[in-house]
């Protein structure tokens, strides 16, 4: 696979022309260099995945998270996708250089696609106020995309409102020379995988749930895609992509008090995607793009021990954008206008949730709970206007400049709504209602203005390049004026690209969490007989930010080996957490958000790959080895994020010692050292491609909260929270993908692919409890993929 490498981005195959055109607006200091690499890796903080890269990688459920899984700057939550829940198809959370998974910026064609309503709440529990969210506003199918760029460090000044990184997905643009239709089908099922389940979890796993935690004992996944590229008139055309990803999961429909399964039912997990872009090359000076986008996700649940508790939870996002590029005599002007609607919802089949102390329902006798809690949702409409002006390069003596300036305005109309009245209560032995709560119908909103200005300059002198920049952000949600300096320098030591050094300092201010402002609106509709109230305080918060020091090295070894090393140090400041207290006089529970969270992260990666593939008997061989190490310490749980309530503790007991809380290693996303060997074999005459990844992960630790009944609990430290780490063994996994495009069917362009994930069927523990119950990663898994272009 051919790769074209520009400092700051890897470009691949047939996508080079468009990608280079896009990147010319950004960093392009030196001449291009060709490399061959099975898996894209960061170059000066940018990793570029083209459609060719996406087709090569085993992308599992087809989400952006699956695509980024092998990136050395990224860590996944290893407890999110396990042997217990392989039927789930939702995107997984990612942490970039140890930052909060809820502080990444997701973009589609440069416009924000981040869901900042309440991304830390991924609970599927049945509740009157629970609306599950996720930081990815659009659940994109990566097979429909032109390319994806991850900015993990040295992030350019035009990107903001993040702490971790930026993920920018590009929708395919019309190409008059490539009018094709593509059909695709991809599938797997529970019969095609090995599940490793702890004996203590087997009963709940076979039932399909434990309380509000859902498992996938029996499922079938079927993914369908259709895409096309069509010229409509001279210099005017359209691309479109449609997909449905569906997982049908069979779980217990009803479980009696004594654990008897009384019937099973099928529950659907569906993600629909529709993307389209109309392009008009009006002249040599003007190009227009009109982009339409939609994703809809829905998941069916019930609480198996509660009759009539069926509900649907999901996300719907849609929007449009108009983009105009204008080539002036002295500069290039880009103007973008967009609108995006992002929403999350929970819709129960019933509006009343009640408990009877004495009832009979099927096999249940005695106390039982049944029903639902109505329909509730929250959403945000973002109206975006942005513009950017890039001056042509000018020179004074040996020094050249290429400055650019930009501005952005986003109006966010965030709202929450209870669509119907619902209520909950308990019927006591006398047949009377107690603990009665009414959730009234209502709707409320808040409007937020977001302003951004930025400027930067590409300065080159001989074989040294500098890019200083500064970004200013303000919004009337937290009313903070945030100034972000960005600086990067690059030195081509011998002016021949054999030895290059990059270094820089950058600051990244995060985005807002809108649920803090919507929560009191939603809670105001709750009428409790007890008179209990809730109050949320967030108005005096600072905007969380990360300071970054980074360095990159690139060295050509001999004629054909490229070595790259990157080091990133991050300090996270003013991270949001919370504390709660109850005012007994007013019966008010007050939740107050604060800026007590902080972390420090050291991140290092090293890779070796070839400038040209090895040619042996008509077979191209592309080897690559990648080392990655990320270690964080701090007083913040990344999974809990802004809902973390422990950061006020100055000291805790950790592994038997009383220590400062912020000196304790971060427990989640804790996979420090990873080494992967990637090896591609391509036989052009037959159309066979065999891609392999062999990955080793060092032994890790699972964090356990100790209670007084645990043997490790130290009674003399009873005033402190106590934690202990349990060792999880190292792991070795092998993923492989075999693709065949028969050369005798060139006109049909048929491709058949098979993925085998975890070929060795390694049994890897990813978590354990304080009672010793382990959770394991998925075992060996088979996928089948068929596509045709015509």
Q: What do the predicted segments below correspond to?
A:
Residues 143, 157-159, 174-181, 231-236, ...:
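Short loop/turn motifs that connect adjacent beta-strands in outer-membrane beta-barrel proteins
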Residues 179-180, 213-298, 315-332, 626:
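Transmembrane beta-barrel wall of Gram-negative outer-membrane proteins
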Residues 275-298, 311-478, 603-613, 617-628:
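Face-selective signature of the C-terminal outer-membrane beta-barrel domain
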Residues 123, 298, 476, 494-545, ...:
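Surface-exposed extracellular loop regions of Gram-negative outer-membrane beta-barrel proteins
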Residues 460-465, 567-576, 583-708:
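Gram-negative outer-membrane beta-barrel transporters
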């Amino acid at each position: 696979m051919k790769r074209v490498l520009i400092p700051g981005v890897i470009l691949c195959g047939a996508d080079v022309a468009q990608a280079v055109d896009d990147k010319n607006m950004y960093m392009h200091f030196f001449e291009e260099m060709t490399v061959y690499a099975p898996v894209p890796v960061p170059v000066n903080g940018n990793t570029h995945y083209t459609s060719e890269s996406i087709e090569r990688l085993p992308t599992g459920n087809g989400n952006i998270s699956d695509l980024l899984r092998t990136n050395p700057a990224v860590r996944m939550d290893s407890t999110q996708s396990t042997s217990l829940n392989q039927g789930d198809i939702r995107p997984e959370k990612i942490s970039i250089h140890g930052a909060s998974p809820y502080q990444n910026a997701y973009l589609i064609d440069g416009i924000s696609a981040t869901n900042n309503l309440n991304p830390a709440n991924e609970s599927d529990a049945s509740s009157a106020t629970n609306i599950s969210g996720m930081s990815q506003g659009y659940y994109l199918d990566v097979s429909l995309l032109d390319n994806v760029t991850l900015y993990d460090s040295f992030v350019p000044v035009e990107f903001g409102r993040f702490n971790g990184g930026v993920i920018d997905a590009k929708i395919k643009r019309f190409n008059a020379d490539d009018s094709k239709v593509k059909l695709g089908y991809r599938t797997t099922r529970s019969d095609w995988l090995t599940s490793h389940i702890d004996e203590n979890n087997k009963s709940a796993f076979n039932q399909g749930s434990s309380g509000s935690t859902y498992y996938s004992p029996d499922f079938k996944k079927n993914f369908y895609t259709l895409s096309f590229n069509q010229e409509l008139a001279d210099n005017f055309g359209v691309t479109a992509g449609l997909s449905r990803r569906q997982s049908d999961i069979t779980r217990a429909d009803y479980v009696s008090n004594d654990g008897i399964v009384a019937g099973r039912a099928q529950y659907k997990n569906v993600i629909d995607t529709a993307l389209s872009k109309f392009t008009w090359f009006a002249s040599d000076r003007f190009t227009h793009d009109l982009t339409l986008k939609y994703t809809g996700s829905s998941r069916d649940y019930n609480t198996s021990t509660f009759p009539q508790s069926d509900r649907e939870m999901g996300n719907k996002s849609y929007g449009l954008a108009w983009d105009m590029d204008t080539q002036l005599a002295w500069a290039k002007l880009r103007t973008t206008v967009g609108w995006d609607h992002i929403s999350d919802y929970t819709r129960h089949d019933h509006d009343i949730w009640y408990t009877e102390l004495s009832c009979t329902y099927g096999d249940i006798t005695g106390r039982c709970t049944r029903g639902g809690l109505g329909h509730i949702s929250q959403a945000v409409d973002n109206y975006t206007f942005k513009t950017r002006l890039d001056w042509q390069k000018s020179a004074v003596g040996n020094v050249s400049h290429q400055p650019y300036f930009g501005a952005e305005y986003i109006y966010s109309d965030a709202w929450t709504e209870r669509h119907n009245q619902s209520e909950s209560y308990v019927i006591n032995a006398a047949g009377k209602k107690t603990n009665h709560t009414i959730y009234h119908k209502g709707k409320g909103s808040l409007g937020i203005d977001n302003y951004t200005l930025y400027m930067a300059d590409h300065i080159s002198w001989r074989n040294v390049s500098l890019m200083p920049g500064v970004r200013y952000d303000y919004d009337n949600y937290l009313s903070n004026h945030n100034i972000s300096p960005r600086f990067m320098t690059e030195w081509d030591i011998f002016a021949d690209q054999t030895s290059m050094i990059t270094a820089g300092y950058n600051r990244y201010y995060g985005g807002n969490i809108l649920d803090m402002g919507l929560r009191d609106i939603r809670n105001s509709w709750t009428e409790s007989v007890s008179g209990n109230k809730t109050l949320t305080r967030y108005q005096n918060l600072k905007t969380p930010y990360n300071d970054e020091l980074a360095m990159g090295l690139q060295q050509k070894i001999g004629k054909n080996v490229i070595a790259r090393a990157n080091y990133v140090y991050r300090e996270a400041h003013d991270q949001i957490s919370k504390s709660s207290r109850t005012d007994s006089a007013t019966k008010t529970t007050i939740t107050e958000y604060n800026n007590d969270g902080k972390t420090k992260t050291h991140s290092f990666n090293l890779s070796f790959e070839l400038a040209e593939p090895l040619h042996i008997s008509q077979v191209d061989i592309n080897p690559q080895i990648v080392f990655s190490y990320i270690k964080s310490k701090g007083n913040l749980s990344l999974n809990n994020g802004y809902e973390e309530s422990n950061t006020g503790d100055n000291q805790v007991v950790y592994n038997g010692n009383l220590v400062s809380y912020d000196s304790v290693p971060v427990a989640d996303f804790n996979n420090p050292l990873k080494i992967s060997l990637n090896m591609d074999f391509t036989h052009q005459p037959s159309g066979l491609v065999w891609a392999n990844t062999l990955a080793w992960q060092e032994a890790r630790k699972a964090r356990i909260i100790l209670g007084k009944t645990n043997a490790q609990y130290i009674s003399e430290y009873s005033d402190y929270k106590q934690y202990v780490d349990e060792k999880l063994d190292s792991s070795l996994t092998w993923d492989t993908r075999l693709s065949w495009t028969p050369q005798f069917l060139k006109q049909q362009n048929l491709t058949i692919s098979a993925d085998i994930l975890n070929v060795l069927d390694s049994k890897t523990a990813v978590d354990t409890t304080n009672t010793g119950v382990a959770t394991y990663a998925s075992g060996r898994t088979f996928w089948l993929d068929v596509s045709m272009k015509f």
